[in-house]
Amino acid sequence: MPKKFQGENTKSAVARARKAEAKAVSDGKRQKEIEDAYWQDDDKHVARKGQRKEDKEKKRLEQLERKKESQRLLDEEDSKMKAKPTKPAAPSKVTRAEIEETLCKEEEHKATTEKPKTHLEMPLEENVNRRVLEEGEVEARTVEDAIAALSVGKELDRHPERRMKAAFAAFEEINMPLLKQENPNMRLSQLKHLLKKEWMKSPENPMNQQHAMYNSH
């Protein structure tokens, strides 16, 4: 009986060859996909990087343009301000009351400066033949001198208002500090009102002196 052929089966070899070829094709295709994906990712990265750079440059140019526009507006406004003539300052308004007050002060000053001095305001020349003592006594060499001295005293008593201003000033100088010390919480107007009330009943008031003199007669 003859031996069987020990060689390779042709069909099996063909199948294996086809399988190996299919595997090689599949592996090559997969490798190509991997490489394509790699290069595609790299392209995307490059594209994103380029886009970021482009956006950054665009923002820089926009900021530069805005700065230029702002500077242009400032320069334009500055030119307008320099070209515009400055208006003179408007004079401050004066009220009618202020005008009247100024006129009254001027009239008072004029009346004070132009007012002729009376015999009471004129300095008295010393008369060796007649002098009035502090106690109110009159020293005279003759009867005529005594009558003249008494006449002057009567003239002063007849017009006490002429001595009011000086007497009140002296009264205020002495008593105002005392009132301030006694009433530290009062305003100046209140202190002056209180001082006036004290003055009206003070024996230093020439008007009160006149009444006292009349009552003594």
Swiss-Prot record:
State the Pfam families in the record: Ccdc124
InterPro entries, per database record = Ccdc124/Oxs1, Ccdc124/Oxs1_C
Give start-end ranges for the coiled-coil region(s): 46-82
Alphabetized, the UniProt keywords read:
Cell cycle, Cell division, Coiled coil, Cytoplasm, Cytoskeleton
Specify where the region named Disordered lies, as residue ranges: 1-128
**UniProt main location, coarse:** cytoplasm
- Where does the record say this protein resides? Cytoplasm, Cytoskeleton, Microtubule organizing center, Centrosome; Midbody
Q: Does the keyword Ribosomal protein apply?
A: no
On the tree of life, the source organism's domain of life is Eukaryota
Q: Name one GO molecular function term.
A: transcription coactivator activity
Tell me the GO BP annotations in alphabetical order. Answer: cell division; transcription by RNA polymerase II
User: May I have one GO cellular component term?
Assistant: midbody
Instruction: Return the Basic and acidic residues bias intervals.
Output: 18-45, 52-74, 95-128
Write out the function statement from the record.
Answer: Ribosome-binding protein involved in ribosome hibernation: associates with translationally inactive ribosomes and stabilizes the nonrotated conformation of the 80S ribosome, thereby promoting ribosome preservation and storage.
Classification via PANTHER family: COILED-COIL DOMAIN-CONTAINING PROTEIN 124
Question: What family does this chain come from, according to its entry?
Answer: Belongs to the CCDC124 family.
Assembly and partners are described as: Associates with translationally inactive ribosomes in the nonrotated state.
Protein name, entry field: Coiled-coil domain-containing protein 124-A
Gene name for this UniProt entry = ccdc124-a
